């Protein structure tokens, strides 16, 4: 599973050092549910600089909202998650 997690992150995520934010394209969320769940949890943990991952129930809800386009901007695990067109931008909460 770790191989698929890393491949999903490598192929579908761009890190901007100047803004310290991640840009996630739409293909990221078209992977199997477990791969999306684990890799998105890992990204939030990295950007939010947390030791523990976020709660699964909250993460499931956010992934569903992203897939159905019912999201504008929200926070989870010290990160701001916003959807712009077909991409999701993940940045650290100040």
Language model regions located:
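AMP-forming adenylation/ATP pyrophosphatase catalytic core
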Residues: 1-94
């Amino acid at each position: 599973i770790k191989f698929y997690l890393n491949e999903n992150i490598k192929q579908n995520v761009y890190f901007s050092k100047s803004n310290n934010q991640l840009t996630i394209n739409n293909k990221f969320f078209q992977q199997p549910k477990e791969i999306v769940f684990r890799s998105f949890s890992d990204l939030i943990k990295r950007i939010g600089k947390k030791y523990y991952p976020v709660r699964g129930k909250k993460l499931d809800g956010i992934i569903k909202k992203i897939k159905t386009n019912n999201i504008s901007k929200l926070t989870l695990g010290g990160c701001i998650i916003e959807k712009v067109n077909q991409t999701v931008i993940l940045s650290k909460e100040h």
